[in-house]
C-alpha cells in the first residue's frame, strides 16, 4: 500500500493493536491463558533450577556448564520478552502496545533468537575441543576464552537485528496499526505498515537465513569432526562415553532447529494466518521448556546436582 494512504497519528507515533489469534473464540481465552501461564512457570522454574545447580555445585564449574548457564539465561529472557504480554492479552484483553514498546519487543525477540543460535555453536565448539583435542582442552577452553566466546555470541546477536529494527521504525503506519500476532514479531509488524513491505520482508528473510543456517552449518561441521574422532576410539565403552557427553547438546540443537522448521513451514503463503501465528508461538515456547528437561534427564552431572539440591533439608542445622 502507498504510504500516502496512511492515516498517521499527529505526533508521528502510531499505536500497535495485537489481534492475537484471530479465529480463536473469546471463550477459549481463559484456558489458553492458563496453558501459557503453566508453560511460562515451567520455563522459569526449569531454567532457574539449572542456574542454581550449576552455580551451587563446584563439580559443574566447567566450560560446558558455563555455556549452559548462558543458554538457560537466554531461555528465561527469550520467553519473558513475549509471554507476559501474551498472558495479559488473553486474561485482560490488553492488546495495545506503544510504538517504542513494540519495537523493543521485536528487537529483543530477534536478539535472543540470534543469541541462542550462536551459544549453541559455542557449545558445539566446546564439545569438539573436548573430544578431538582432549589434552589441549584445559588450555584452549580456559576461563578467559570461555568468557570471550560467550560475550562475542551475545554482542553479535545484540548488534545483528539493529538495521532491520531501524528500517522497520522508519516505515509508515496508521495511527492504530493492527498486528496479526500475539506479540511484535518482525514480519507481522512489517505487514502492519502501509509502506511497501517487500524490502523489509526480504531483509528479515535474509537475516533469518543467515542466523538459522550458518550456525547450523558450523554445528554440523563440529559434529563431523567429533564423529570421526569417536570412530577412531577402539573400545565400545570409550565411544559410548564420548557420545554421551554430546547427547544433551545434540538433543537441544535438534529441538531448536525443529522449532525453527515449524515456524518456517507455518509461514507458507497457502496456509491460514493462524498457522503463521501458532508456528511462531510454538517456536517461542518449545525450546525454552524442553532444554531444562533434556539436561536434567540426559546429563548425569546436572541430574545429580539438582537431586542433591532438592534433597537438602532446609531445616537442618548449619555450622556457624
UniProtKB/Swiss-Prot annotation:
Tissues expressed in: Detected in the keratinocytes of the epidermis (at protein level). Detected in hair follicles in proximal outer root sheath and hair matrix keratinocytes (at protein level).
Pfam families reported for this sequence: 7tm_4
Chief location bin: membrane
UniProt-annotated location(s): Cell membrane
UniProt cross-references to Gene3D superfamilies, sorted A to Z: Rhodopsin 7-helix transmembrane proteins
One Gene Ontology cellular component annotation held by this UniProt entry: plasma membrane
Segments passing through the bilayer: 32-52, 63-83, 103-123, 146-166, 201-221, 246-266, 277-297
GO terms, molecular function: G protein-coupled receptor activity; olfactory receptor activity
Membrane topology: Multi-pass membrane protein
Protein name: Olfactory receptor 2AT4
Organism: Homo sapiens (Human)
Designated gene of the protein: OR2AT4
Amino acid at each position: 500500500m502507498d504510504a500516502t494512504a496512511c492515516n498517521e497519528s499527529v505526533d508521528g507515533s502510531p499505536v500497535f493493536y495485537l489481534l492475537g489469534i484471530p479465529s480463536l473464540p473469546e471463550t477459549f481465552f481463559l484456558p489458553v491463558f492458563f496453558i501459557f501461564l503453566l508453560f511460562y512457570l515451567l520455563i522459569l522454574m526449569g531454567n532457574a533450577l539449572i542456574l542454581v545447580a550449576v552455580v551451587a555445585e563446584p563439580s559443574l564449574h566447567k566450560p560446558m556448564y558455563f555455556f549452559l548457564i548462558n543458554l538457560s539465561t537466554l531461555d528465561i529472557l527469550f520467553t519473558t520478552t513475549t509471554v507476559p504480554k501474551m498472558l495479559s492479552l488473553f486474561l485482560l484483553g490488553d492488546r495495545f502496545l506503544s510504538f517504542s514498546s513494540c519495537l523493543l519487543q521485536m528487537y529483543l525477540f530477534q536478539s535472543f533468537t540470534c543469541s541462542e543460535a550462536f551459544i549453541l555453536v559455542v557449545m558445539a565448539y566446546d564439545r569438539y575441543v573436548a573430544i578431538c583435542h582432549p589434552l589441549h582442552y584445559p588450555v584452549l577452553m580456559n576461563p578467559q576464552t570461555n568468557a570471550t566466546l560467550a560475550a562475542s555470541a551475545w554482542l553479535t546477536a545484540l548488534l545483528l537485528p539493529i538495521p532491520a529494527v531501524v528500517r522497520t521504525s522508519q516505515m509508515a503506519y496508521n495511527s492504530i496499526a493492527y498486528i496479526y500476532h500475539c506479540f511484535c514479531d518482525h514480519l507481522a509488524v512489517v505487514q502492519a505498515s502501509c509502506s511497501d513491505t517487500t524490502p523489509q520482508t526480504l531483509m528479515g528473510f535474509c537475516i533469518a537465513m543467515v542466523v538459522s543456517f550458518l550456525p547450523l552449518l558450523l554445528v554440523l561441521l563440529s559434529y563431523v569432526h567429533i564423529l570421526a574422532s569417536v570412530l577412531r576410539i577402539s573400545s565400545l565403552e570409550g565411544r559410548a562415553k564420548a557420545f554421551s557427553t554430546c547427547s544433551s547438546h545434540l538433543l537441544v540443537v535438534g529441538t531448536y532447529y525443529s522449532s525453527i522448521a515449524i515456524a518456517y513451514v507455518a509461514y507458507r503463503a497457502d496456509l491460514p494466518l493462524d498457522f503463521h501465528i501458532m508456528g511462531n508461538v510454538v517456536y517461542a515456547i518449545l525450546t525454552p521448556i524442553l532444554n531444562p528437561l533434556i539436561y536434567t534427564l540426559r546429563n548425569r552431572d546436572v541430574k545429580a546436582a539438582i537431586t542433591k539440591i532438592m534433597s537438602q533439608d532446609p531445616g537442618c542445622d548449619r555450622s556457624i
